[in-house]
Curated annotation (Swiss-Prot):
This is Pre-rRNA-processing protein PNO1. Residues 1-25, 37-74 are annotated as: Disordered. Component of the small ribosomal subunit, ribosomal RNA processing complex (SSU RRP complex). InterPro entries: KH-I_PNO1_first, KH_dom, KH_dom_type_1_sf, KH_PNO1_2nd. Keywords: Cytoplasm, Nucleus, Ribosome biogenesis, RNA-binding. The keyword Plastid does not apply. SUPFAM superfamilies: Eukaryotic type KH-domain (KH-domain type I). The keyword RNA-binding applies. Required for small ribosomal subunit (SSU) synthesis. Has a role in the processing of early nucleolar and late cytoplasmic pre-RNA species.
Amino acid sequence: MPAPTALKQPPPAPEQQAAPAITNENEDELLIDIQQAAATLTDPNAAEPPEETMENEMAVDEEGRPRFAPGKNIDPIRRIETRKIPIPPHRMSALKANWTKYPPLVDHCKLQVRMNIKEKRVELRSSKYTVSNEALQMGADFVSAFAMGFDIDDAIALLRLDSLYIQSFDIKDVRQTLGPDALSRAIGRIAGKDGKTKFAIENATKTRIVLAGSKVHILGAFENIGMARESIVSLVLGAQPGKVYNNLRIIASRMKERW
């Protein structure tokens, strides 16, 4: 055992492992890679991207404007829509009797139609054969016109003519102080004896009028509806039928001159 005051000897260093010698083959590969990298950096054409093929190039005309392929006609995606038109109870029997006269809804508008007797309504639905976007609304107007009381032939005119409209108003809105007796008298003044006054207004203004209780429905062109409404309002307010007839004759003569 050495003395405590003796000098300590440093521990022996571990034997260093000899590094593996690089073979000649690895040296050759390193030299080749270095030479290729240097050639790539010095070559100006090496960094350019590959040229596009003729297929990817955009075709242009003589003025330099691009030419595109003609567009294809693609049918738009149509959403199936439905309409449910309620039918008053007093019009259900007329609807059943005239149901065979409803082919224009299928032939002209290309709609699917069915009568829901339990719910008392007519249901319309567009299909893949429906061409016009307005066909469903035209069919709904047709059924609504029949439900209001118009004749089936007059309602079919809504499908064939785009210039026809329906306007409704209440007699009580014209004269709000009408009592039960005054309301019946106003309706009688509009209709006339055996319906002569109503027919005279229809023939002079080329419209169709339906009296349903206190409601008045007018079918016709926009200007014609305005003239018929003025005549009806005059009768409700108490104008003499003779004066209204004279105004209708003037209106009829003006319409003949215009057309």
